[in-house]
Amino acid sequence: MTKQAKLGGSFTLPGTPIKLVRMGYGAMQLAGPEIWGPPRDVDAAIAVLREAIAAGVNHIDTSDYYGPHVTNQIIKKTLHPYPDDLVIVTKLGARRGEDKSWLHALSRQEPEGNEQYDHASVRDVTI
């Protein structure tokens, strides 16, 4: 079993009862090369997530455009049902092109809006 690490202390989000360890885990590298597609070694990606949680990390930063969709799906597959104190944060509005490009973020004023992307991000990490 992993020894819980000293991760820089913790803080409570203002106005909430949510207490976060200062050191989180950024999930961008769970995706494949160029942050596209699945990782070369899915089992290793799963092991990294499990080790982060075992070390005391209680918040994960992710996004639906990592992969796209890949990191959120790996997080859900690995950690669901989620620990009560785990906080998953995401970014909304950005998109990836079919050519693996990083497209500009959508604004709420654009005709297609963010709704379809926002829903995909939430769908992939929730029950």
Task: Identify the meaning behind each predicted range.
Residues 1-90, 94-98:
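N-terminal binding-site loop/beta-alpha segment at the start of enzyme catalytic domains
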Residues 99-127:
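Glycine/proline-rich, positively charged
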